Amino acid sequence: LETAFQDVTNVYHCAALVSFHKADFHRCLQVNREGTANIVNFCLKHKVEKLCYVSSTAALSYNSNGLTDESFKWIPGPEVSGYSISKFAAEKEVWRGIEEGLNAVIINPCVILGPGNWKESSLSIFKSASKGIGFYPSGSNAIVDVRDVVLSMHYLMNAEISSKKFLCTGP
């Protein structure tokens, strides 16, 4: 990473391990929290102008009374996935960086869909549906087009906005 950060002005941190398997909990935590801590530290060291961290709505607490927004405080519970815990822990690393002087924004997209690999992404639901495999997921999830996420990230990086987080969901 040392070489990658030479002469970099803006960083879009989108990398994460996405898994909802209990066996992947420690790996998710390591990749997502420690990876983000490394990115934050390099941004601070190399005086990056701005960081956009892509988190997830999974890092927000569930609101049993209606819609969730950015102000919800994290309340872990037995139904919270390891992925959710890892993304929340990664967000805490970004907030640490902000406290240390990093100019950063956090975007929390819901389930992202768009052109891509139907085998290893959220698009796998379409692969199942195309084979006639019916399903109905429990709970509720919003979806957003990947192009809308990218436009939102671009806007946030070019706006005079810092030290805030934003939900990014579809219509």
How should these model regions be labeled?
Residues F20, T57-L67, I112-W118:
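Conserved catalytic-site region of short-chain dehydrogenase/reductase
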Residues L1-E34:
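NAD(P)H-binding glycine-rich loop region in Rossmannoid oxidoreductase-like domains
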Residues H26, E34-Y83:
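Conserved Rossmann-fold NAD(P)-dependent oxidoreductase catalytic core, especially the SDR/UDP-sugar
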Residues N10, G35-N38, K50, A89-A90, ...:
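Conserved cofactor-binding/catalytic machinery of classical short-chain dehydrogenase/reductase
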Residues F126-F135, G139-P171:
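Alpha-helical substrate-binding/gating segment
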Residues Q30, N65-I106, V111, G134-F135:
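Catalytic helix-loop patch of NAD(P)-dependent Rossmann-fold dehydrogenases
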